């Protein structure tokens, strides 16, 4: 829900234009007050207001007006295999210009760069580009290429598109798309043929907008534009209908250590583009009885589609996709079901080709736990903790799409962390927004609470943890099955014992007990192997090699010719 921020005036926030010395704007903190722009990697960074996009989206009607994600039960999403082309328009407002140096070059690097050079606005702090993120998540089966245009300057002030009221129903994202395209097409960069952006079809799959200044979702006033994705129904590009739009802000509300304003982190753009691929938000929607501010109700920073878009100073190294999300998109991921007593060793993470494990409810195949090894590598390099991540999944019986609301039923989340320390804290709960002293320094209590979520709790700094067992007797929140109709909880009768994490090698190990009611029988040692078979383009084709036609397949990360 938008907060009415005491008549914040955009002109008072932004006076940097046309001055010899760049004047930095104020940003909005978690309590709705103005604060000085904090320095990157300082404890004050965590004070910036970072709001879920659903705070805005849920206040709008579920119509096909481009202002909601609930656009259809069977929408056609952006293709997520092969190479696709997406136009990006850099948009300035009448009263708000770009602040970063060389904006076109900066956002070409932001979206497509293979390296992140310092262009004067902390660009090098992004771990990689948006395209590199999706290449990594898809094991190189998906390669989005972004064509950057602009900047173009619109005739209206930012407030015209960002709105003013607390309900959020006066934002005009579709008008922003329409006006941006009109300005582009009247410029020297006018697109002559949009076929390249139809990616084999007859409709432009998605238009991406980067708008100047702050976003309301990350430090901006209630008059700024909110990062979002939705239906672009009614908009066209060179005679081609546009299916989706995504948009995000230029800035993230921080300054570099030498005082320069910083370009945004790639996290929000990765999150928004993932909606155009069909993935839903994982956090609870504000329109539900749950709202945001509930502990142990979702994934928080452990999922890009939750708070993970803001990992590392506001999203400069966003959290990788979970195994669940990779499977939803049909991207290569090895998930093996645990169905007997065994000793499990997980030497590598799924990002490095390792195995994730599934424990299935014997009474409901749509309900299960997923187990992943989170290591300090790749897009997890700046994560808050490492070790065994356990999360509870309870899928709806129908197909997942971008408007699916997994976590709107309080106490019965559809996808939520099983925290080693007993608390997966909500970033939106007031009691979690404060600071705590660690080694003589004030740190974010919320971030410190995240450090205890992964087993065995090695990285917790709030308390010394070594949680070596997860079972009905050694219970943690979300470690249970749901009774029919979400009428209560049932014991799992499963157990993970002797959980370890080797901080040198990054190896996770544990003993799995399949049925605790029958006592502990022999433990069969199980190394991380895979039987899942994929085509060269990343399509999963089952586990029976003999049943497949002649061709080249990928099994366990290796090419096999039949």
Placement of each model-derived feature along the sequence:
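Short, surface-exposed, low-complexity cationic segments
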Residues: 378-390, 547-557
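Residues that act as N-cap/strand-start positions at coil-to-secondary-structure junctions
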Residues: 351-355, 492, 547
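A short beta-strand micro-motif
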Residues: 27, 359-361, 532-535
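C-terminal outer-membrane/trafficking sorting elements
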Residues: 518-562
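Bacterial Sec-dependent N-terminal signal peptides
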Residues: 1-23
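Extracellular hydrolytic enzyme modules, especially secreted metalloproteases
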Residues: 206-385, 394-396
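Propeptide-to-catalytic entry region of secreted or membrane-anchored zinc metalloproteases
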Residues: 21-269, 280-290, 298, 393, ...
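Hydrophobic, well-ordered secondary-structure elements that form the walls
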Residues: 371, 498, 538
């Amino acid at each position: 829900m938008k907060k009415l921020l005491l008549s914040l005036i955009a002109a008072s926030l932004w006076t940097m234009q046309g001055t010899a010395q760049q004047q930095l704007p104020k940003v909005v903190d978690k309590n709705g007050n103005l604060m000085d722009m904090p320095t990157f990697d300082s404890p004050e960074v965590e004070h910036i207001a970072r709001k879920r996009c659903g705070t805005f989206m849920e206040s709008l009607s579920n119509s096909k007006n481009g202002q909601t994600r609930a656009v259809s039960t069977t929408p056609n999403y952006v293709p997520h295999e092969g190479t696709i082309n997406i136009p990006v328009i850099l948009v300035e407002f009448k009263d708000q210009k770009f602040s970063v140096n060389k904006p076109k070059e900066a956002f070409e690097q932001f979206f497509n760069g293979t390296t992140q050079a310092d262009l004067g606005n902390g660009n090098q702090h992004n771990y990689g580009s948006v395209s590199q993120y999706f290449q990594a998540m898809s094991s190189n089966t998906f390669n989005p290429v972004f064509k950057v245009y602009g900047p173009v300057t619109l005739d209206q002030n930012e407030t015209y598109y960002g709105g003013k009221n607390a309900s959020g129903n006066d934002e005009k994202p579709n008008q922003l798309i329409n006006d941006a395209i009109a300005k582009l097409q009247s410029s020297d960069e006018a697109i002559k043929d949009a076929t390249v952006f139809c990616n084999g079809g007859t409709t432009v799959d998605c238009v991406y907008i980067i708008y100047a200044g702050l976003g309301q979702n990350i430090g901006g006033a209630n008059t700024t534009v909110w990062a979002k994705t939705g239906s672009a129904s009614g908009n066209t590009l060179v005679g081609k209908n546009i299916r989706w739009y995504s948009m995000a802000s230029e800035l993230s509300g921080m300054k570099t250590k030498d005082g320069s304003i910083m370009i945004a982190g790639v996290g929000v753009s990765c999150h928004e583009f993932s909606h155009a691929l069909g993935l839903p938000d994982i956090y609870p929607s504000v329109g539900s009885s749950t709202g945001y501010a509930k502990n142990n109700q979702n994934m928080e920073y452990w999922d890009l589609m939750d708070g993970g878009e803001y990992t590392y100073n506001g999203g400069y190294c966003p959290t990788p996709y979970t195994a669940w999300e990779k499977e939803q998109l049909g991207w290569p991921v090895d998930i093996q079901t645990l169905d007997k007593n065994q000793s499990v060793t997980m030497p590598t993470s799924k990002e490095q080709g390792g195995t994730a494990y599934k424990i299935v409810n014997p009474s409901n195949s749509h309900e299960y736990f997923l187990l992943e090894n989170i290591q300090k590598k790749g897009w997890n390099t700046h994560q808050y903790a490492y070790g065994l991540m356990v999360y509870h999944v309870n899928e709806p019986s129908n197909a997942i799409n971008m408007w699916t609301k997994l976590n709107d039923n309080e106490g019965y989340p559809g996808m939520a962390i099983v925290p080693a320390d007993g608390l997966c804290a909500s970033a939106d709960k007031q009691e979690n927004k404060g600071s705590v002293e660690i080694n003589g320094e004030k740190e974010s209590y919320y971030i410190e609470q995240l450090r205890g979520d992964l087993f065995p709790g090695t990285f917790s700094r709030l308390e010394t943890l070594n949680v070596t067992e997860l079972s009905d007797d050694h219970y943690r929140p979300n470690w249970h099955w749901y009774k029919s109709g979400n009428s209560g909880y049932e014991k799992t009768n499963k157990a993970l014992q002797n959980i370890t994490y080797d901080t040198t090698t990054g190896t996770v190990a544990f003993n799995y007990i399949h049925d605790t009611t029958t006592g502990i029988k022999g433990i069969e040692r199980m190394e991380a192997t895979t039987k899942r078979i994929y085509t060269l383009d990343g399509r999963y084709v089952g586990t029976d090699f003999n049943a497949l036609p002649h061709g080249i397949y990928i099994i366990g990360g290796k090419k096999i010719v039949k």
